[in-house]
């Protein structure tokens, strides 16, 4: 019998399954607006994911990227992770809505009792996304309503919720602005990050309760989680890279004492918080850039 570790009720366990995204959203926190490459296959990290399923009890799980629908292995992630947490209710795939023409993929996600979190980043995408959602759900007996949500920028917006047998199946949100990310500037193809007070930056981070699993290992946050992907494919200033390379991670096969200590400190600030801004300023995402920035 494995020891079970419980995350706080507000926390998200985020499985990052691809660096690739088809959009160019400025200030994307995981830098997927750049020419990022590589998808991850569930089979490569299956053992670690299954071990997390044995020892970790998260209140919420989100499969994300990048754009998860761009990963040809998405459904293997959906089915595989659902087997790891067969009874979890708040379990979603987060998408920008531009791949919803893949009706059978969406139905397969819904049939695994995950819900689809559609986060639109350009008003011009709305009509087509809604049409694809309604086509996807046409084979089910569904109901829908509208609520008011708040995103990580504290902006309020309408959420269109679709339910099957009382269970959330799709949420359509208009997220047309992002807050600042860890980029202070890009100069001569080098990404320079902030030098903030880490405590203040952490307190003001809207994603501080989103903990990332990347290549099967657990990280404090999105930036520490993607740091190897980022520094392998792009040039980051030397001071920031050095700090990122010191990021802690937790392998599910680590000694139980190490896992307990790591999870117990998940909600605390880390030295890498200094790389994010102390204050986040909202910026409209649209019109989206026509091509990804080459740096």
Report the location of each language-model feature.
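Soluble or luminal CAZymes and related metallo-dependent hydrolases
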Residues: 9, 40-44, 73, 128, ...
